[in-house]
Amino acid sequence: CIRDRRLGTQIKSRRLKLLGIWLFHVLGKRYIGIFLDPVLACNFRCKMCYFSDEQKRKSLRGTLKYEEIEAIAGSLFHRALKLQVGCGAEPTLHKDLVKIIALGKRYNVPYVSLTTNGNLLTKELLAAAVKNGLDELTLSAHGFTRETYEYLMTNGKFDLFCKLLANVTEIKKQYPQFKLRINYTINNNNIEELSRIWEVVGDELDILQLRPIQKIGESEYRDFDLTNIHARYDAVLVPLIEECRRRHITCLAPNKQNIIVLEENEAEDNSIEKITYCLSLIHI
């Protein structure tokens, strides 16, 4: 899926992209990514997230029944290149998490991932998810010390994060193709802790995604200034990117010249993404 996305970015012609999508559609091929939030709730109140805003939380409620997810699967999963469970909330709060992952594999979705803070993910639950077809675990992390992790990820426990990483190591022995991704949102409080990643994460990391902080609604955290992150790029991010390359780890990071350019630029044409990525949430 990473290769497929990169191929899409290498093709610059919008018309050629649309032609390719049309051909995939008429030939019955897979061409969409599905991002599914089975429950609109979270056990964390991360300071950079809209779940730290009490008013926003009041509008985020509801759970998809498994039968409703089956209906979504029947309509869309046969077209999916990727199913990502969890994108704007915490999917491990759903009681049928493993069944949802298994449903993706029942429809032969090539790549099924789970995005989570991980604190509710026991070794038994993770093992069951991988056994039933989970290809990738994406863990959100906003710090690599207990102090910063628990400060930025309110309600989170650093010990549970570290325990989960140890469980991933054990599960990978049985399922070596299973992948671990870390999503790290960089701000002025945690940029220097990136140098500690290896002593915390160990040797099992497959993908590291680094994203400068952006405002995604109202949140408790208010420091969106990227000036220092830009200034520290060569000292902090470049060595990390090079170390990832040495370890054969995929590192997804912005270029220095783009560090202060918002990805959600209103002038950018995102029509291709709109027709190839399907977002499913529920409000009750």
Identify the residue ranges that each predicted region occupies:
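Short boundary motifs at domain starts and secondary-structure transition points
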Residues: 1, 22-27, 266-267
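Conserved small/polar residues in nucleotide/adenosyl-binding loops
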Residues: 1-5, 282-284
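Conserved alpha-helical substructure of the radical SAM core
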Residues: 6-136, 147, 151, 163, ...
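Radical SAM enzyme [4Fe-4S]-AdoMet core and its adjacent flexible, acidic
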Residues: 37, 52, 58-59, 64, ...
